[in-house]
Amino acid sequence: MFKVDLNSDLGESFGAYKMGMDEEILKFVSSVNVACGFHAGDPCVMDKTLNLAKQNGVCIGAHPSYPDLLGFGRRNMQISFEEAKNYALYQLGALFGFAKAKGMKIQHFKAHGALYNMAAIDENLALALCEAVASFDENIIFLGLSNSAMNEAAKKKGLRYANEVFADRAYNDDGTLVSRKLEGALIHDENLAIKRVIKMIKESKVTSINGKEIDLKADSICVHGDNIKALEFVKKIKENLEKEQIQICALENFI
């Protein structure tokens, strides 16, 4: 039987600002990526998010970002190896404090936004993130884009690596994600997106935006629950995976 993890970004509210439908999405996913304060989230939100994850039996991961609250972590930054490593360590430590207080463990590490996209093509940046994870806890799974520089970096640092794919995003011919700024970056046809997901899991292939068949491994599928429509889409994905006898379970069960 095929196994796959469903992950979603959570805890992205902060202060008086509420974002996402965290309570609802937790009913359908097996792992969550918790914002650690640099692009979103704050101590109270982190506390609440971990409580919700624990109540629902969902595994947690750190979701660190560039220090860019204003830009929601989606703006590229040029930072040094040491800065990248230390920013990652700082955010891991923040989440660990809450996790330890609740008797929980950090299952995985997944970079956010621009940090994720840049680390996918910049092995030096990816190595900095992997070094942070390895020095913090070598048992933490590094979750990153399938067939990317992050995968190679994780191997070099001796970390377990989980290959992530996206249900609603288009791919370039080289396996990177099409920029959100470009037309066609998001797939709005739900049935097409679900067919693509099943193909990625069962055949380890996806069709790029230019029609090229590319190889990739799907250990975890990133889904979103920002609004009612997105939530309904996640429910449909889960239902279709179960029909295909694909088992949904957290990464720690098979990576």
Swiss-Prot record:
**Regions crossing the membrane:** none
| InterPro entries associated with the record | Glyco_hydro/deAcase_b/a-brl, LamB/YcsF/PxpA-like
Q: Which EC number(s) does the record attach to this protein?
A: 3.5.2.9
Q: Which UniProt keywords apply?
A: ATP-binding, Hydrolase, Nucleotide-binding
Q: What GO MF annotations does this protein's record show? A: 5-oxoprolinase (ATP-hydrolyzing) activity; ATP binding
Q: Which CDD domains match?
A: LamB_YcsF_like (cd10787)
Q: How does it assemble?
A: Forms a complex composed of PxpA, PxpB and PxpC.
Q: According to its UniProt record, which protein family does this protein belong to? A: Belongs to the LamB/PxpA family.
Name the UniProt record assigns to this protein: 5-oxoprolinase subunit A
